[in-house]
Amino acid sequence: MSKRLLILEDGTIFEGEALGANLDVTGELVFNTGMTGYQESITDQSYNGQILTFTYPIVGNYGVNRDDYESIHPTCKAVVVHEAARRPSNWRMQMSFDEFLKSKNIPGITGVDTRAITKIVREHGTMKASLVQARDEVDHQMSQLQATVLPTNQVETSSTATAYPSPNTGRKVVVVDFGLKHSILRELSKRECNLTVVPYNTSAKEILEMEPDGVMLTNGPGDPTDVPEAIEMIKEVQGKIPIFGICLGHQLFSLANGATTYKMKFGHRGFNHAVREVATGRIDFTSQNHGYAVSSENLPEDLMITHVEINDNSVEGVRHKYFPAFSVQFHPDAAPGPHDASYLFDDFMDLMDNFKK
């Protein structure tokens, strides 16, 4: 295998072996602590523009299959692993991890100390990084990295460009796609919801004209303040139709009601984040993937905190006191991860049914 370098913004350089597509890329370096679920993570649009480091020591041992995609066209910049499995085996497997990365034009690096990389990010925060072929001109590559300005509003490249239906016989739900995970559609479809998926910039007028029973605000990448049109849409829709927001949808719903958001030092990315429900004390283990959070300081009077993360006490869920609307920062759809919080989809069904009475 040819050699590659992972160059960090702080000047640290890791050398390893090439994996996946033959590309030089620059992105935001983040880490995921999950032990499995690499296919779902890489195809999660929330990683748009990011270099994804897996902390688990071996990745790819069960290959890649046709069922576990969260999106067909992944947008993460690159992947970093300590060891890529060379002899994967699973009855569902269609291709190896390396073949999958090549098919999706995603470069990677293996044979590096991913726990050392994670420690740097934990101590210094997320930072820019470049994955390049090992050459002599490292100083030039470093200067290029320092000069690179990462793009904003990744939602634009993660959302569907046109509306499309996913028909069923039950409640009519408009799903606003900010970087939709397929597992959200699966959870709604299991409950027989008649779905229409719309682009992120769909207006409130267009949504209201569809006369839905509810609106789902999905997950997605980046800074929620980069999507002002969605914030305005939520302001106009709430109170007229029940709303359920997940991940980025949670942040946008909170901003629409006067809350503020902030960039976290290194975010929550993994499948074992413990979340406490404030009202009952119930603890759920959740799947999370976000670098921004809703601030608990000066939270608007109209919102109440429903869930908090037990390690850093960050806001993990809010509910509107007067409108039929709530949101959570974690992924109740899991995929991958625990299904402790899947009951929230049932709460959304009840919210729509009660609103119609």
UniProtKB/Swiss-Prot annotation:
Pathway: Amino-acid biosynthesis; L-arginine biosynthesis; carbamoyl phosphate from bicarbonate: step 1/1; Pyrimidine metabolism; UMP biosynthesis via de novo pathway; (S)-dihydroorotate from bicarbonate: step 1/3. GO terms for molecular function: ATP binding; carbamoyl-phosphate synthase (glutamine-hydrolyzing) activity; glutaminase activity. It is an enzyme of class 6 (ligase). The active site is at C247, H331, D333. One of its GO terms (biological process) is L-arginine biosynthetic process. InterPro entries: Anth_synth/Amidotransfase, CarbamoylP_synth_ssu, CarbamoylP_synth_ssu_N, CarbP_synth_ssu_N_sf, Class_I_gatase-like, CPSase_GATase1, GATASE. The keyword Magnesium does not apply. Keywords: Amino-acid biosynthesis, Arginine biosynthesis, ATP-binding, Glutamine amidotransferase, Ligase, Nucleotide-binding, Pyrimidine biosynthesis. Residues 172-357 form the Glutamine amidotransferase type-1 domain. Residues 1-168 are annotated as: CPSase. Composed of two chains; the small (or glutamine) chain promotes the hydrolysis of glutamine to ammonia, which is used by the large (or ammonia) chain to synthesize carbamoyl phosphate. Tetramer of heterodimers (alpha,beta)4. Belongs to the CarA family. This is Carbamoyl phosphate synthase small chain. It comes from Lactococcus lactis subsp. cremoris (strain MG1363). The lineage of its organism: Bacteria, Bacillati, Bacillota, Bacilli, Lactobacillales.
